[in-house]
Amino acid sequence: MTKNGIDVSEWQGDIDWSRVRTDFAILRAGYGREVSQKDKKFERNYSGAKANNIPCGAYWYSYAVSEDEARKEASACIEIIKGKQFEYPIYFDVEEQKIFDLGRDKVSKIIEAFCHELEKAGYFAGLYMSAYPLTKYTTEHVKRRYAVWVANYDVSKPDYSGPYGIWQKSSSGIVDGIAGNVDVDVCYTDYPTVIKNLGDNGFPKHTAPAHTKKTMKVTVEYDDHTYSGLLEEQ
């Protein structure tokens, strides 16, 4: 299964979502530690995507250089996205060199701190990074623990050997309804099904008596890799 998508922020201006043709969209919710740092177009983009039946996820751009700062960023992110439904993960966007300068173990702890807060609040957490820092500055546990969205341009496939669900392949896409260039992505994972089955990201959790619960096999495809696991009905 392959889906083609885009990711957007206030830098794309006022998007005419009625003209956009895409399988999914990842929206910037905001950045930093304060609710006041919400992306100026987030509400408009969320409403526009939903009104036009475009499944969406969200991302939060990080400046955190400690676990405590990461938790504060998570709190701001959760405040902004609460009450909404997302078919795709909520991603922690790590790009700042000052974060990478802390080293792999510290970077990984910062990622875990943010994602743990998201999961506690009922969200399906993911990590966005470029291929090189993702390889160099995260532990194997982090690479496999969270949904990975990897950025790598001008290549036929990402220069990254770990599992990933979405590949951001270019920043120069042209999409009707959006003025100027936009990031374009390819998704290999059926996140909407997984997230809805889990009851994450604002979707209702399905409960049933213990004796009627079923266990289903979920297969997640990551480019050349396929990972399977068991998911119990909630």
Segment roles from a protein language model:
Residues W60, M129, N152:
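Short beta-strand/turn micro-motifs composed of small residues
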Residues E69-K72, P133-K143:
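Glycine-rich, charge-decorated loop segments at or immediately adjacent to ligand/cofactor-binding or catalytic sites
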Residues T207-Q234:
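Short, low-complexity, charged amphipathic interaction modules
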Residues I78-F92, E96-K98, Y137-Y164:
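Structural recognition of alpha->loop->beta junctions
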Residues M1-S18, H141-H211:
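Functionally critical loop-and-helix segments that line ligand-binding/catalytic clefts
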Residues L118-K136:
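Aromatic-lined carbohydrate-recognition surfaces of secreted/lumenal glycan-active proteins
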Residues E34, V65, L134, K157, ...:
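Flexible, glycine-rich phosphate/dinucleotide-binding loops
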